[in-house]
């Protein structure tokens, strides 16, 4: 940070109000976003300059707890923004918002650091190539396909399966992916972060020595955590720290990087907390007035260039299941594909609880996925929509009052609904069912055959929690044999 030869710019704490610390500088004021450091017992606390108040006082946001800080203690201006370690040394490590290791394995030993605030790549550098990313999850690959170098949002309320879905995507994509991945845990449960680390170790995504201890050499993922118990400053910046590490692999090493964020809503929530602490007048629903700007600055950096790509998967919590809430609504415009998780579908016991009519992708076009895939997806949505429209009639009058054609549609829709469920690898310990990875060709063929009525005679339960259609047929035969 500051070089030994340069005279240090030193200030003193004049006020501490929770995570907000005011610092008085007698000489030179540090610019906005500069990192300051102060000692708190044995630890070094990083403060980021947020406002110039006048009278030589700067208002800063702490990246760590301020318990123990006192008025009058020294604060050192580092002369630069918060910088985090980048490069291969970060792989296999767990770091906090300022890039310090929290996995008790000693210093990172990185040869290079980069500031967490940066501009998005210029238009001339950006790439517009489209290639489909296979996830192995039927409902996603068929109805809302993801693209390499694209941005994906997993929207859902509390407890409908966002984290399980993001972990399955990590399992299916990151494990088979040759390049590197970065996972940013933003304001989520520490337990989930710990579970994910151990899953990566078991799967070999984080390499280990003969004693089972994690090592950087051979590891494929860097983890950056700023979890629920951290102050708002850390939660508002940890996504940027993770993104900076991903940008290094994209720009300096020309890699195709996977960037997972759980949860983007907590980034916005922390921004709202910081905004209130800084005394800004809130906008709609109490969010910060800079909501769209903050989101844009983060999202515009997550992009593909001619050197490499960043494919990002972001879990986005939806407060009170309201997709029109300003926080989830602010991220819609930035995404290439949206996967919406529905409480109504999860209550039916269908997992992943993806809403096939609400989820969308700009990649679902004949020129990208092909005519057969496109037509099958649209036919599936049409059948499900007709079923939805008929549900009121069924509830009031019963199935007997429907026409023959409508009864066929309802039967196929119910089979499709169940067939959109799928056992996950990461949920094997809970469900007792082995996880399934289904190739896109099998998915398209299976749904086309259901639409064409080839399996109208199979019981609906045969389609529940299976992989390809061949497994559904085998399950139906087994059910028939057991019933006989």
UniProtKB/Swiss-Prot annotation:
GO terms for molecular function: ATP binding; ATP hydrolysis activity; proton-transporting ATP synthase activity, rotational mechanism. It catalyses: ATP + H2O + 4 H(+)(in) = ADP + phosphate + 5 H(+)(out). It is a peripheral membrane protein. Its EC number is 7.1.2.2. It is found in: Cell inner membrane. The keyword Transmembrane does not apply. ATP binds at residues 156-163. Residues 104-123 are annotated as: Disordered. It holds the Pfam family ATP-synt_ab. Keywords: ATP synthesis, ATP-binding, Cell inner membrane, Cell membrane, CF(1), Hydrogen ion transport, Ion transport, Membrane, Nucleotide-binding, Translocase, Transport. CDD domains: ATP-synt_F1_beta_C, ATP-synt_F1_beta_N, F1-ATPase_beta_CD. Signal peptide: none annotated. Coiled coil: none annotated. It comes from the Bacteria. F-type ATPases have 2 components, CF(1) - the catalytic core - and CF(0) - the membrane proton channel. CF(1) has five subunits: alpha(3), beta(3), gamma(1), delta(1), epsilon(1). CF(0) has three main subunits: a(1), b(2) and c(9-12). The alpha and beta chains form an alternating ring which encloses part of the gamma chain. CF(1) is attached to CF(0) by a central stalk formed by the gamma and epsilon chains, while a peripheral stalk is formed by the delta and b chains. Produces ATP from ADP in the presence of a proton gradient across the membrane. The catalytic sites are hosted primarily by the beta subunits. Belongs to the ATPase alpha/beta chains family. This is ATP synthase subunit beta. The lineage of its organism: Bacteria, Pseudomonadati, Pseudomonadota, Alphaproteobacteria, Sphingomonadales. The gene is atpD.
